[in-house]
Amino acid sequence: MKGKFLKVSSLFVATLTTATLVSSPAANALSSKAMDNHPQQTQTDKQQTPKIQKGGNLKPLEQRERANVILPNNDRHQITDTTNGHYAPVTYIQVEAPTGTFIASGVVVGKDTLLTNKHIVDATHGDPHALKAFASAINQDNYPNGGFTAEQITKYSGEGDLAIVKFSPNEQNKHIGEVVKPATMSNNAETQVNQNITVTGYPGDKPVATMWESKGKITYLKGEAMQYDLSTTGGNSGSPVFNEKNEVIGIHWGGVPNQFNGAVFINENVRNFLKQNIEDINFANDDHPNNPDNPDNPNNPDNPNNPDNPNNPDNPDNPNNPDNPNNPDNPNNPDQPNNPNNPDNGDNNNSDNPDAA
């Protein structure tokens, strides 16, 4: 059994990879020796639109080849309206290898980019063109947004099982992030244990290229590691983990049987990596990056307590008279030396004021 290791709570826990091998009499373990950054390959000719491989023998080879982690919480249901809302960027992946075809999941996050796992892209053995993507696939005969061929792979430099895949445009010169709206990423400022989440992807124990959603709660969260109590199977690798706002908070990688399923949590390190490599990635509440200390008043970062009067932060109730906040209209104001009604004004020659000195 091929094992991968992820540091969790200062312990190393053996984890099973979750790519599914289909239509193959034998399978080699997924290689971890692929280059971290495959060079971009120029597309000289229009590539034919990829098609989903199908047939009666399209099924997982062996359960040992995938993390088949069904937990007591097995709340899974099929998504048939795959082009609706946050489901649209969820993507079915096939990796064509000499030993067969691996199936997995991913999520579109930019004009021409998708997120999935390192162990999925490792199956390309250095040839990005071996990876095909079908956003919003409904089944093996119906993928409304067509297929796309990868052209470049960038693997996360940290421990997390995360990779960015860049795609060539299709025959109509459309990019994958133009035929579907890319997913919104969470800044994860409020993400915590016990929150409701969903993992949405293409599990290998269901009909080929059908989208399924699994519901559960976060059970552990530290650094780049996130664990949850919901069920997944092989093929779910690379699935987005959504919060209740339908924002992506992590990328599912697999699990440990009878214990948990897990994802790469998008913490600050991961977020910085994504921003550096995906120019148009969209993080929620990231519209005013230069004013992080005053999110409620983005146009007045220097005066967070008085957004309605940026020119007079010390006197929000009297924006027109910052020098006399207490009584601008008072004619008897003792601090006004030129006030003819001021009895303390020694320069006052007003005959109507008998108390004047």
Swiss-Prot record:
Coiled-coil stretches noted in the UniProt entry, renumbered to this chain: none
UniProt region (18 X 3 AA repeats of P-[DN]-N), positions on chain: 289-345
Listed Low complexity bias regions: 40-54, 291-357
Region (Disordered): 33-58, 282-357
Keyword Zinc: no
GO CC annotation: extracellular region
EC number: 3.4.21.19
UniProt Sequence repeat ranges: 289-291, 292-294, 295-297, 298-300, 301-303, 304-306, 307-309, 310-312, 313-315, 316-318, 319-321, 322-324, 325-327, 328-330, 331-333, 337-339, 340-342, 343-345
Domain of life: Bacteria
Annotated catalytic residues: 119 (charge relay system), 161 (charge relay system), 237 (charge relay system)
Site (Cleavage): 68-69
Keyword Zinc set for record: no
One example GO MF annotation: serine-type endopeptidase activity
Subcellular location: Secreted
Signal peptide: 1-29
Class in the EC hierarchy, top level: hydrolase
Function comment: Preferentially cleaves peptide bonds on the carboxyl-terminal side of aspartate and glutamate. Along with other extracellular proteases it is involved in colonization and infection of human tissues. Required for proteolytic maturation of thiol protease SspB and inactivation of SspC, an inhibitor of SspB. It is the most important protease for degradation of fibronectin-binding protein (FnBP) and surface protein A, which are involved in adherence to host cells. May also protect bacteria against host defense mechanism by cleaving the immunoglobulin classes IgG, IgA and IgM.
The family this protein is said to belong to: Belongs to the peptidase S1B family.
Protein name: Glutamyl endopeptidase
Organism name: Staphylococcus aureus (strain MRSA252)
